[in-house]
Regions:
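Periplasmic/extracellular electron-transfer cofactor-ligation site
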Residues: 25-26, 54, 60-88, 112-120, ...
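Mature, folded catalytic cores of secreted/periplasmic enzymes
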Residues: 48-50, 69-70, 80-85, 95-98, ...
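C-terminal motif of bacterial Sec signal peptides marking the signal peptidase cleavage site
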Residues: 17-20
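Extracytoplasmic electron-transfer domains, predominantly the class I c-type cytochrome c fold
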Residues: 84-143
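Bacterial N-terminal signal peptides that target proteins for export
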Residues: 1-8
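Sequence context surrounding c-type heme c attachment/ligation sites in exported
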Residues: 57-68, 101-105, 129-132, 154-156
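Electrostatic cytochrome c docking/interface patches
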Residues: 25-62, 152, 158-163
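Sec-dependent N-terminal signal peptides
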Residues: 8-14
């Protein structure tokens, strides 16, 4: 007995439907960095947004969980504790203070705490709390939001003299 055209057509449509419901093997893997960047309002001009790359966005996340209460004038929860501290800590975006410091100095003060570099003992050491990568992310964020903007030191020219 031969199947009729209607039966063949129904089987073909059923096969197409079943294959459409299966997993797609050619789907591109999700890119975890695709939406990882962020922005930060300029602390001196709220109409301006500073674009952050992935590393800087990770530093922002750390800043708002670990540093905001002493290194900003306000926090997501309200006023910060900054004005109650002596000496008053630098604002995280204060380029007039922080731009003059090297990345190594900032890494040391974050890792070892304020008293290790003759600053306030109120600044705790984060070397056991944050990874080295997280500390570098935090420094990258600091550099990104600095006002005036941070200018990396110029590298010296090559000492090689061509013939």
């Amino acid at each position: 007995m031969k199947p009729g055209r209607a039966t063949l057509l129904a089987l073909l449509m059923l096969a197409a439907l079943v294959s459409a419901c299966g997993k797609r093997g050619n789907a591109a893997p999700a890119d975890p960095l695709r939406n990882a960047f962020d922005t930060e309002p300029d602390w001196n001009d709220a109409t301006k947004l500073i674009q952050l790359n992935y590393q800087q966005a990770q530093g922002k996340r750390i800043f708002y969980t670990q540093c905001v209460y002493c290194h900003a004038d306000s926090t997501p929860a309200g006023p910060s504790n900054r004005s109650n501290l002596k000496p008053v800590p630098a604002l995280m975006n204060d380029g007039t203070v922080l731009n003059a410091e090297s990345d190594e100095y900032l890494q040391n003060i974050i890792t070892l705490g304020g008293s290790a570099v003759s600053k306030s003992a109120m600044m705790p050491p984060y070397g056991q709390t944050l990874t080295k990568e997280e500390i570098l992310d935090l420094i990258a964020y600091t550099r990104a939001i600095a006002q005036p903007p941070y200018q990396a030191p110029a590298r010296q020219g090559s000492q090689f003299i061509g013939r």
